């Protein structure tokens, strides 16, 4: 393999555009793959702007060889639309880094990647699509990966970029902590409000109660998380910019399908599996499912 792996990226949305721009900044521009042939990608951040030249390829038949590293940055609701891309871009020597929410990426993707190794990740930076189709990166980019041999390929690819990459020997705990953060974001969908809503005392109390329910499930699944985690997560939302959104709220406001199952339904599913009461999930999950899928 050359000094740096051949790289493709599927899904140039907010997270995908961020990773593509960071790689482009150091002359490792990935092959861009998606549904729409955008002529370019634009990332804005505190220090300026990065323009990644396109076009975004929208036909898997235009490529005829696998890549060393594939970043998969589509939402889990869009994975079914990516099967042709995964079959084209992957073989048994490929590492697929899933830049996705949830704790089930490996199980969900392994049957689709043509023998490649699936590497889950935790994405720690907020990036949001703007009305002009650019992406606004609102914090320093950071990824956490499991400390396994295939992670080295991602570390090598992102070395020298603005994105910090951390390896964790207890990735299960890290992934579940991020899932708790994502889960409580579901409350924003039902209120149709951004992070400012967490400054309300009643919402903060509801969020804490829900996060404690989530914490019990996370621990049953093997996560080692302190009792302080629910309050820490609420504090993050409380002190965030009032206009900070989350991807599931953006999807609801755009009338797109929601990742309700992998962000919230998973708590209910594993709770029932372990015999853990999930009274808040039992109300929240059907409402999120209905918001996503209707009818009505």
Regions found by a protein language model. Name each.
Residues 8, 31, 95-97, 144, ...:
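A structural signal for isolated positions on well-ordered beta-strands in alpha/beta enzyme cores
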Residues 5-6, 68, 141:
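Nucleotide donor/acceptor-binding cores
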Residues 65, 99-178:
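Rossmann-fold dinucleotide-binding core
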Residues 172-216, 241-242:
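Active-site-proximal catalytic alpha-helix in oxidoreductases
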